């Protein structure tokens, strides 16, 4: 007979808004369906997260760039993403940005939220990611990474939780543990931060 630890009931799983349906499992039927097993494994991974690494374009922004007549490149960001970044930092999570872009406005916005690990103009992200691990003292098994395009794949393959916005390229979506229901620049950053913080009991109460 299966042990009690192998029995997962609906009430045992935290309500963190994950896009999955968990059926009620009576205590005398210790059987997990594939979707339930996958969900439990994801919860286990999310519980291990101590730090986050994000791409910028297509994650914090919507991948669109406005070009002024003077040639200035303008991007927009979601205010709610920024609010939860602040909460996550206050809760003790480390947050790092690794981006191929070089926007000073983007840097000012994100460092203004309290992010100190900001790396821009990066063509190969894996070496920078590994340098961040060394400087932070974190392990790849403690990192959630969110990216949306091909350059993010080497890092996505290294972390415990690989995540992406809903409008990511197919190659990224195929390998990610978690695909946010929200697109880049529209709350996907808040989505993954909120899920981890709620699952770990670090979401602020008001």
Regions found by a protein language model. Give the residues of each.
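Non-catalytic pre-domain segments flanking phosphatase-related domains
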Residues: 1-54, 205-206
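Short, basic/glycine-rich phosphate-binding loops at helix/coil junctions
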Residues: 60-67, 107-113
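Basic, amphipathic juxtamembrane/active-site segments
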Residues: 64-87
């Amino acid at each position: 007979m299966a042990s009690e630890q192998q029995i997962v009931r609906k009430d045992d799983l935290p309500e963190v808004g994950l896009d999955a349906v968990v059926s009620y499992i009576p205590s005398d039927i210790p059987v997990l369906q594939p979707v339930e097993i996958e969900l439990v494994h994801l919860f286990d991974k999310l519980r291990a997260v101590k730090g986050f690494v994000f791409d910028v374009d297509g994650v914090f922004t919507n991948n669109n760039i406005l070009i002024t007549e003077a040639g200035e490149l303008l991007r927009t960001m979601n205010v709610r993403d920024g609010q939860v970044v602040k909460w996550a930092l206050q809760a003790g999570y480390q947050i790092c940005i690794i981006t191929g872009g070089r926007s000073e406005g983007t840097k000012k916005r994100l460092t203004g939220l309290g992010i100190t690990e900001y790396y821009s103009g990066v063509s190969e992200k894996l070496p920078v990611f590994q340098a961040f691990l060394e400087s932070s003292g974190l392990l790849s098994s403690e990192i959630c990474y969110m990216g949306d395009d091909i350059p993010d794949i080497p890092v996505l393959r290294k972390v415990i939780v690989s995540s992406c916005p809903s409008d990511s390229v197919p190659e990224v979506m195929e390998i990610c543990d978690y695909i946010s229901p929200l697109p880049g620049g529209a709350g996907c950053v808040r989505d993954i931060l909120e899920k981890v913080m709620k699952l770990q009991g670090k979401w602020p109460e008001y």
